[in-house]
């Protein structure tokens, strides 16, 4: 290569012109640029040779001359000619086409235009081939989309900055949703998020100079006002729908405006009965009521009236399919997510005080010992007389209110019934139960005591379930029977060594097998019943609604809407959704339990050692007795089951499900209760 040859090579990602000075060795040359700076290059690094006869002083003028010729629009005109001719070109040929000569300045300008072009030409060796018309059209379309995306990206960043500066001031656009949803999924699923979502979310976080972590994504969504500080990630990870589709809401409205014909035209009129509904004060879906009467022959009859949503819902309609998809009403500390639209669930479906309501009523006569002597099941009309809370009923029973003898009679039969089930092998487990509520960001925890009112309602619901199952079994009716295998409990002598109360109940609870839903009736061990089906919550539990569909059709003399095979198929999908709902409820309650403890980090709590989780690691389950919360705790000293402790929160992080408790006062080993420990 001659000294004085002007060449192009790339330096730090940019074109660079230099004049060849001398060889350095057999493989390298020394070239000098316009700043008289020397560079050592390999000939393979040369991307274009302009020609000999140049000095470094001439480079700036040469570059200025080239700059005047760099018109990208002229390349399109040349492409139109060449694509029609089907001819490839090199820089010299393109210079001739564009500038009508092959002067070094124009040839180099043509080289720059061709090598920088990504639209009209593609390089093949030393020549450039024109792309086809369709290829150019596709590339232009892609470029337009890329430009649009870049503009949307820049606009999104601008809106994000505005929202961070002034929360609530931004109207998000449809084009923002993909990035914001990716951010939500990254914060929700964390390391398990889709890689594409993670990448998009991390790009947003990086652009806002925030850590590229799921926790930072969560904090950003809160700062933007899109999420609450205590956003329910368990609910977001689930498939549980929060909003009702428009078609379902439309059907609910139409059923309210124009009620369908009642399939049970011969409903029994029970409006003469005094009906008590007994629930928590916050209950909105009122699905059961109780009555008591004395028959002409002197026998006493209990009535358990269950709300009849099948008056408003038919198998396979929009309301039914949506309820099936949800499977249950979800009860969370922050509120409920209903199975049916609220306007119909808390309206005509519910047993509202003073209104004539449709019900499925179970009339039961018990033997003096508490066994079912006779029963009847009828579609009915009732008029609930009183809406009472559990506290109201407990007070009435305590005071012996003479004006309401029905309440005392129902409570008496509830106790008889409980004793009868105990004689049949029922297994009672009375563990403290916490009710966690969040109202206006205030977290409260209330212990639900096993009061007489709660016991009598529970016994009546269990009674209705036994009667429904008996009816299904007697008529060979496909129903979702609920069964529970007999547990293998520790020997009584071993249980008696444990402190009575929560410790002993915890040991029994640990041995209890899960209840199962089956089309075949079988014993329910913990209830002490030979057959049982849940039917008392059809507004909020889809399996109960299924039982109503089946029983009511049979009462009318019709073929049940679901065959055994169809019922089994529906139950499989419903059971999976119900299990997910239970998981969300459990995890959400735990989160708010930990949040309550975080807010009361300096408070002292009375703890009780329930059982060992891993005794060799000194890891036990403790019960915070005032709160009904069960938490794992690791000890650094010997402890005994049933030992009472004074505890304080050492560290708690609700979002990451971490809590560490510590003892405030540590007794000596000699002070430990002498209790046989049952792992």
Describe the function of each predicted region.
Residues 124-140, 236:
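Accessory beta->alpha helical hairpin/"wing" motif in late/C-terminal subdomains of nucleic-acid enzymes
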Residues 108-113, 126-130:
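Major-groove recognition helix of helix-turn-helix-like DNA-binding domains
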Residues 168-272:
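Low-complexity, highly charged intrinsically disordered N-terminal segments
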Residues 136-161:
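Short, amphipathic alpha-helical interaction segments positioned at domain boundaries
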Residues 2-6, 10-16, 25-27, 35-37, ...:
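Electropositive polyanion-binding surfaces
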Residues 50-61:
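Compositionally biased alpha-helical segments
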């Amino acid at each position: 290569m001659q000294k004085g040859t002007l060449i192009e090579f790339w330096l730090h990602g940019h074109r660079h012109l230099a004049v060849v000075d001398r060889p350095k060795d057999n493989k390298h040359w020394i070239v000098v640029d316009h700043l008289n700076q020397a560079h050592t290059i390999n000939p393979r690094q040369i991307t274009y040779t302009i020609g000999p006869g140049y000095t470094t002083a001439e480079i700036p003028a040469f570059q200025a001359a080239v700059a005047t010729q760099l018109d990208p629009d002229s390349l399109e005109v040349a492409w139109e000619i060449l694509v029609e001719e089907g001819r490839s070109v090199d820089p010299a040929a393109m210079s001739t086409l564009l500038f009508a000569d092959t002067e070094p300045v124009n040839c180099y300008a043509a080289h720059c235009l061709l090598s920088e072009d990504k639209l009209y030409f593609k390089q093949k060796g030393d020549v450039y081939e024109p792309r086809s018309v369709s290829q150019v059209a596709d590339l232009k379309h892609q470029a337009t989309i890329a430009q649009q995306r870049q503009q949307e990206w820049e606009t999104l960043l601008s809106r994000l900055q505005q929202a961070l500066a002034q929360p609530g001031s931004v109207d998000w656009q449809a084009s923002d949703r993909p990035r914001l949803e990716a951010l939500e999924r990254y914060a929700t699923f964390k390391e398990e998020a889709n890689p594409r979502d993670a990448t998009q979310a991390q790009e947003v976080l990086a652009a806002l100079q925030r850590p590229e972590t799921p926790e930072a994504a969560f904090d950003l969504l809160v700062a933007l006002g899109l999420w609450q500080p205590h956003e329910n990630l368990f609910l977001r990870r689930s498939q549980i729908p929060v909003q009702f589709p428009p078609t379902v809401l439309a059907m609910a409205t139409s059923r309210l405006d124009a009620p369908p014909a009642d399939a049970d035209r011969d409903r029994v009129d029970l409006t003469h009965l005094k009906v008590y509904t007994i629930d928590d004060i916050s209950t909105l879906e009122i699905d059961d009521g109780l009555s008591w009467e004395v028959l002409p022959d002197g026998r006493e009859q209990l009535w358990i009236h269950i709300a009849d949503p099948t008056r408003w819902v038919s198998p396979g309609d929009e309301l039914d399919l949506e309820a099936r998809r949800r499977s249950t009403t979800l009860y969370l500390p922050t509120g409920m997510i209903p199975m049916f639209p609220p306007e119909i669930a808390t309206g005509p479906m519910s047993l509202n005080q003073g209104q004539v309501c449709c019900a499925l009523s179970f009339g039961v006569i018990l033997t003096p010992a508490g066994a079912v002597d006779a029963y009847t099941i009828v579609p009915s009309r009732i008029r609930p007389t009183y809406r009472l809370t559990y506290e109201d009923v407990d007070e009435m029973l305590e005071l012996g209110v003479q004006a309401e003898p029905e309440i005392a009679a129902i409570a008496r039969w509830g106790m008889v019934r409980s004793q009868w089930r105990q004689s049949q092998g029922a297994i009672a487990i009375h563990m403290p139960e916490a009710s966690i509520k969040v109202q206006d960001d205030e977290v409260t925890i209330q212990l639900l005591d096993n009061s007489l009112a709660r016991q009598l309602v529970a016994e009546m619901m269990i009674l209705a379930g036994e009667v429904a199952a008996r009816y299904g079994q007697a008529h060979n009716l496909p129903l979702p029977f609920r069964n529970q295998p007999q547990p293998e409990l520790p020997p009584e002598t071993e249980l008696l060594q444990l402190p009575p109360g929560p410790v002993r109940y915890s040991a029994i609870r640990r041995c209890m097998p899960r209840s199962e839903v089956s089309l075949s009736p079988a014993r329910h061990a913990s209830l002490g019943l030979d057959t049982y089906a849940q039917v008392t919550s059809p507004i909020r539990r889809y399996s109960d609604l299924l039982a109503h569909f089946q029983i009511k059709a049979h009462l009318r003399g019709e073929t049940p809407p679901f065959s055994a095979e169809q019922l089994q198929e529906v139950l499989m999908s419903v059971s999976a959704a119900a299990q997910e709902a239970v998981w969300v409820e459990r995890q959400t309650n735990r989160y708010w339990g930990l949040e309550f403890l975080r807010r009361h980090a300096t408070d002292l709590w009375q703890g009780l050692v329930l059982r060992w989780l891993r005794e060799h690691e000194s890891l036990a389950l403790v019960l915070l007795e005032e709160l009904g919360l069960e938490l794992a705790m690791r000890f650094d000293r010997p402890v005994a089951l049933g030992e009472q402790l004074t505890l304080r929160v050492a560290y708690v992080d609700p979002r990451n499900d971490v809590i560490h408790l510590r003892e405030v006062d540590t007794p000596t080993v000699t002070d430990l209760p002498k209790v046989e420990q049952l792992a």
